[in-house]
Design a protein with these regions (language model features):
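Alpha/beta-hydrolase active-site loop signature
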Residues: 33, 58-62, 124
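Flexible "cap/lid" loop of the alpha/beta hydrolase fold
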Residues: 101-149
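Active-site glycine-rich loops that stabilize anionic/oxyanionic intermediates
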Residues: 31-34, 97
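Active-site loop/oxyanion-hole signature of alpha/beta-hydrolase fold enzymes
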Residues: 2-15, 40-48, 52-98
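Short beta-strand/loop motif that positions the catalytic acidic residue
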Residues: 204, 210-212
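Short beta-strand element of the alpha/beta-hydrolase
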Residues: 22-31
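Conserved alpha/beta-hydrolase catalytic His-Asp/Glu region
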Residues: 134-204
């Protein structure tokens, strides 16, 4: 569904189910240069268990309008605005990679809005190598190839999907290629620059699941 956040058209996938007023929400936040589609299976699973799904496209990603946000804190503030625009008072929050930092920052600074936190493929801090950053800044395709390569295990490189015919590396590289100019650099730089994580961990009040 589309909502309005900061006067910009914003896309939120709902797992093909309408939101039900009063139901618990679960907010999914994608990683660098990705979009809501990485959460398709999880969204459908939890939607069919009665949760209101908010798999967001951050500004400048996927189907959402607007410029990319240059900081993790800024993205976290935006997520709260998206919850407000969706009339979702409280939510479970789940993030992958860059999205895990955003989810973490939301949980740390807005504890009254978050009931539990899940962080997938995460690290605090989340340093990014100079070679990757330089290639991303130059908007070279090799930056997307690096992200794709390092995002999959050895078994996935050999076609280790449980779904016959699924090519995980091929799917991700096409997703990264759909991102606009400068998006991958913006997101990687935001991860690199997020220096408040260890200190903010003291503010986390909600139960937290790490999937590493």
């Amino acid at each position: 569904m589309y909502i309005d956040v900061d006067n910009q058209k914003t896309y939120i996938a709902t797992g093909s189910k309408d939101h039900i007023q009063g139901n618990m929400g679960i907010t999914f936040i994608h990683g660098t240069a990705m979009d809501h589609t990485v959460w398709t299976l999880a969204s459908r699973h939890f939607a069919r268990r009665g949760l209101n799904i908010l798999a967001v496209d951050l500004p400048g990603h996927g189907r959402s309008e607007g410029n990319v946000i240059p900081s993790i804190e800024g993205m976290a503030d935006w997520v709260i605005k998206a919850l407000d625009a969706s009339n979702q008072d409280k939510s479970i929050i789940v993030g992958h990679s860059m999205g895990s930092l955003v989810a973490f920052d939301v949980a740390a600074r807005y504890p009254d809005r978050i009931t539990s936190l899940a962080m997938v493929g995460t690290s605090i801090p989340m340093p990014v190598g100079d070679v990757l950053l330089d290639n991303a800044k130059a908007d070279k395709h090799v930056a997307k190839e690096m992200v794709n390569f390092w995002s999959h295990s050895q078994s996935a490189h050999l076609g280790g999907s449980q779904v016959p015919g699924t090519w995980m590396l091929g799917k991700l590289i096409r997703l990264l290629e759909r991102s606009g100019p400068g998006v991958i650099y913006n997101d990687l730089k935001a991860c690199q620059d997020y220096s408040e994580g260890l200190e903010r961990s003291k503010q986390i009040q909600s139960p937290t699941l790490l999937i590493l």
